[in-house]
């Protein structure tokens, strides 16, 4: 099974995460930030990955450190669970609509961290959640999972719908990219021979 656990403890957060890339979409989430847990659940359900997150963060300041550090820890766990990357499809994309909103996520499990994030949220907050933190989560994940990620919200009027389509599309693209290709068993999906 492709799974991993990561603990990350700093002066700002104490985090324990676990991920199973070949799961059934089950999640156990306690970041202390309700909307963020709702978004992480989208990754698990649409990515068919089992994800567990337990976090105690400095929420008396704001949610920035919590969201960013969960992204870092999940990225580390994802990378460990993926292992040597042999046999995976590597590239994937997904479009996801939710009513008026439509987002596209394209990714490459390349070994090269890179984030292109083109989202203009229609408001600054979703409830108490600062929409700037969506990008912070993905930057943390990308840096530590070592993947190239393009996120584009193509349209949307409701900020909740914009965010939800992004996280759903991310989960679906991850699921497709980590899928084992029966024609690539034991083969590195790169002409370089490594990722």
From Swiss-Prot:
Keywords, comma-separated and alphabetical: Amino-acid biosynthesis, Cytoplasm, Histidine biosynthesis, Lyase
The molecular function terms in GO held by this entry are: imidazoleglycerol-phosphate dehydratase activity
The protein's matches in Gene3D superfamilies, at most eight in alphabetical order, are given as: Imidazole glycerol phosphate dehydratase, domain 1
Subcellular location per UniProt equals: Cytoplasm
Question: Which EC class, in a word?
Answer: lyase
Gene Ontology BP annotations:
L-histidine biosynthetic process
Which CDD domains does this UniProt record tie to the protein?
IGPD
- What is this protein's record name? Imidazoleglycerol-phosphate dehydratase
Location, primary (coarse class): cytoplasm
Superkingdom, according to UniProt?
Bacteria
């Amino acid at each position: 099974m492709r799974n991993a656990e990561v603990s990350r403890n700093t002066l700002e957060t104490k985090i324990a995460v676990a991920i199973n890339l070949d799961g059934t979409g089950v999640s156990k989430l306690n970041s202390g930030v309700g909307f963020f847990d709702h978004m992480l659940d989208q990754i698990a359900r649409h990515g068919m990955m089992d994800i567990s997150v337990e976090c105690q963060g400095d929420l008396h300041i704001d949610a920035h450190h919590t969201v960013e550090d969960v992204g870092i820890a999940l990225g580390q766990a994802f990378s460990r669970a993926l292992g040597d990357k042999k046999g995976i499809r590597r590239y994937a994309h997904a479009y996801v609509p939710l009513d008026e909103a439509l987002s596209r996520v394209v990714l490459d499990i390349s070994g090269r961290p890179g984030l292109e994030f083109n989202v203009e949220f229609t408001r600054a907050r979703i409830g108490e959640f600062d929409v700037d933190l969506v990008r912070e989560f993905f930057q943390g994940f990308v840096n530590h999972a070592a993947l190239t990620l393009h996120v584009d919200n193509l349209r949307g009027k409701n900020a909740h719908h914009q965010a939800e389509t992004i996280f759903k599309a991310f989960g679906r693209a991850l699921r497709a990219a980590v899928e084992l290709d029966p024609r690539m068993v034991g083969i590195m999906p790169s002409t370089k021979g490594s990722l």
